[in-house]
Amino acid sequence: MAILKLIEIFSSWRKGRVLRKRLKPLDFGEISWKSTTGSTNQDLLLKAQSGTNQLSVAIADHQTAGKGREKRQWISEKRSSLLMSVRFEVDLVSDPISLYSMKLSVSVVRALEMLGFSEIKIKWPNDLVTIHDGELHKLAGILAQSTIKGSHASVVVGLGLNISLVNLRTLLPDDHISALSEIGQPPDVIDLAEGILREICVFDLKNDSLLAEYEKYSHTLGTHVRVEVDEEIFEGLAKRVTQTGSLVVKLDNGSEREISVGEIIHLR
């Protein structure tokens, strides 16, 4: 067992070394790749307190305490997912935190498209989905967490992307989930991480290019949705996404509601 553990640690270290070398010309901070960690998001939030550089990256082959939206547990199996977090240093006066999770979701879809996966869409706010027989199947989840001091924030955005399912459907029998292995030949995990991180460097949040790309890949816009916010439920047409990432829904009476948090169900 000790030898197998050492092999896992060395394999992860090697992947991190290769990735750091490939991304050296770009403006990334520390890039770490572990065999196992509690949570890549928490790793970077802790490092933020010590003042580590902008665009630090944490990747793991396995997480033991991963979290999804609404404090749900994020379940993954060893070496079956890309588990990656990126830290941004943010001026809250000019850049809403929500735009950084949008930035990561668009970067992932664009990177996957370049690797041959062209049918992946974004379900608001930032789930990546595939569509089988008219039903949405979750391929990846994105979670943003932050520490705020005055008008400055350290924002950590984490990604859990299913590469293969192994036994995940047995563990989550009631969930509609998917993996890259079900829709094509899974890419090398280093190539995948590199592609996503390169895409992150493309977008300047001070122009409309990010929003335009988000709308291009959105599966939610133009569909009828049921929205659940706190204890309120309403239905309408998903019309557009605002500059801060909120979803605008047109109700049957012609009025519009803007939501920044909540669960949506696609009706048709």
Model region roles, listed by residue range:
Residues 1-114, 134-138:
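N-terminal lobe of the biotin/lipoate ligase/transferase fold
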Residues 52-54, 124, 232:
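Short, basic and Ser/Thr-rich N-terminal targeting/leader segments
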Residues 2-14, 18, 93-120, 130-268:
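Long, positively charged amphipathic alpha-helical accessory segments at protein N-termini or as interdomain linkers
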Residues 35, 122-124:
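Short loop/edge segments at beta-strand edges and connector loops
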